[in-house]
């Protein structure tokens, strides 16, 4: 597969046409931003960490029945994906109160949200991604009621799958952002799932394991990304088979 003309460039990713119809290449760059681009830097290897984690999550979700745009990795920072007609919505699933929900509502940070709260924002930097309700989404013709229902169901399924997966690695999935697109009438998960788009806390220490480290100057963000990427993608050990209790000689004699 050959990478062709640039189609789109965002804050931290670039999307390219390819010589295969219906397939694009997403390049995860080493750029990192916060506060609508008000804070930005370029950090070596950041793109490869996010690409690797995204590929890992996409593959895991595909195995568990979630359709994603991911096809295969091209190298450590580029992946081939299905070309989708993206829906300009950011779907945020919140399991614990943190970030903007604490600033805007009377929640204490770390409060469990049961059931999980789904917030949908209009993906538009010029308007600072305003929050939408279902009626506004339909009125703006961004998605149909049936598509919205489907998107929310997929988001909750992803939340269940990833919360369980991360818990095994001692990580709490606080909240995360998803983006979806269409191919025909089918809804696919697009964009990325990485430390840039998730809020993760260490279960034991409460330490931030995501872009908040960069956002709020909590430490070395690249050391964090490196450590978290290795932790998330670490192969799962199969459950140990239960050992059968040894049969005593007395039991053998009684059964003869």
From Swiss-Prot:
Keyword annotations of the record: ATP-binding, Ligase, Nucleotide-binding, Purine biosynthesis
Listed InterPro entries: SAICAR_synt/ADE2_N, SAICAR_synt_PurC, SAICAR_synth, SAICAR_synthetase, SAICAR_synthetase_CS
Enzymatic reactions: 5-amino-1-(5-phospho-D-ribosyl)imidazole-4-carboxylate + L-aspartate + ATP = (2S)-2-[5-amino-1-(5-phospho-beta-D-ribosyl)imidazole-4-carboxamido]succinate + ADP + phosphate + 2 H(+)
Region entry Disordered, spans: 234-256
Matching SUPFAM superfamilies: SAICAR synthase-like
Keyword Nucleotide-binding: yes
Enzyme Commission identifier(s): 6.3.2.6
Superkingdom assignment: Archaea
Claim: DNA repair is one of the keywords in the record: no
Class of this enzyme: ligase
Pathway annotation: Purine metabolism; IMP biosynthesis via de novo pathway; 5-amino-1-(5-phospho-D-ribosyl)imidazole-4-carboxamide from 5-amino-1-(5-phospho-D-ribosyl)imidazole-4-carboxylate: step 1/2
Sequence ranges of Basic residues compositional bias: 240-256
MF terms in GO: ATP binding; phosphoribosylaminoimidazolesuccinocarboxamide synthase activity
A GO BP annotation: 'de novo' IMP biosynthetic process
Family in the record: Belongs to the SAICAR synthetase family.
Protein name: Phosphoribosylaminoimidazole-succinocarboxamide synthase
Native organism: Methanoregula boonei (strain DSM 21154 / JCM 14090 / 6A8)
Lineage: Archaea, Methanobacteriati, Methanobacteriota, Stenosarchaea group, Methanomicrobia
